[in-house]
A protein has these predicted regions:
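Alpha-helix-loop-beta-strand connector modules within alpha/beta enzyme cores
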Residues: 4-18, 73-100, 131-140
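Alpha-helical segments flanking ligand/cofactor-binding loops in enzyme cores
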Residues: 53, 81, 105-106
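Conserved, mostly hydrophobic/aromatic
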Residues: 55, 107, 115
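Glycine-rich phosphate-binding active-site loops on the catalytic face of alpha/beta enzymes
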Residues: 67-70, 97-98, 110-130
Length: 140
C-alpha cells in the first residue's frame, strides 16, 4: 500500500527508484515494530539468505540487512558473509547496532558494501572523531 502511494511521487519528481530488499533482523527496533515485520532470527542466517536471494531473483540490486535503530548489536558478521557469498554482485548494506570502528570493520570484512549508522552518530559526544574512526576502520 505505501509503495503504491509513493510511486506517483517518484514519477512526478523523477527520482531514481532503487530496487532494494529490506530484511529486518532481530531485534528490529522501531522499524520492526512500526512495520509489523516478521523479524529474521539472528541465529538463522540461511533464512536471511533465502529472502535476499528471492529479492535478487525479483530484480533487486541492493539488499539491506537491518538490525534496527539503536540495536544492542549489529547484524552478525556470519550472516553478512553468507549473504554476500550467495548473492555475489548484489550490493549489501548493513545497518543498526554499529557503534565502533571495529564493528564496522568486521562487517565490511564479512562483505558489507555499505554500512549505515544513525543512532551512534547522533549520540556521539564528538561526531567528527566518531566518523573518522569509522571511515579509517573500513578503508579498503
Amino acid at each position: 500500500e505505501n509503495q503504491a502511494m509513493g510511486a506517483p511521487l517518484v514519477l512526478r519528481y523523477r527520482l531514481e527508484a532503487l530496487p532494494m530488499a529490506y530484511i529486518i533482523i532481530e531485534p528490529g527496533g522501531t522499524v520492526g515494530y512500526v512495520g509489523d515485520a516478521r523479524l529474521i532470527p539472528r541465529k538463522k542466517p540461511e533464512l536471511a539468505c533465502a529472502y535476499a536471494l528471492a529479492g535478487k531473483y525479483l530484480g533487486m540490486r541492493l539488499v539491506y540487512l537491518e538490525a534496527g535503530s539503536g540495536a544492542d548489536s549489529p547484524v552478525p558478521a556470519s550472516m553478512v558473509a553468507l549473504t554476500k557469498k550467495l548473492l555475489g554482485d548484489v550490493l549489501i548494506i548493513v545497518g543498526g547496532g554499529i557503534r565502533s570502528g571495529r564493528a564496522a570493520a568486521e562487517l565490511v570484512a564479512a562483505g558489507a558494501d555499505l554500512i549505515v549508522t544513525g543512532t551512534a552518530v547522533e549520540k556521539s559526544q564528538d561526531v567528527a572523531s566518531f566518523i573518522s574512526e569509522l571511515t579509517s576502520s573500513i578503508r579498503r
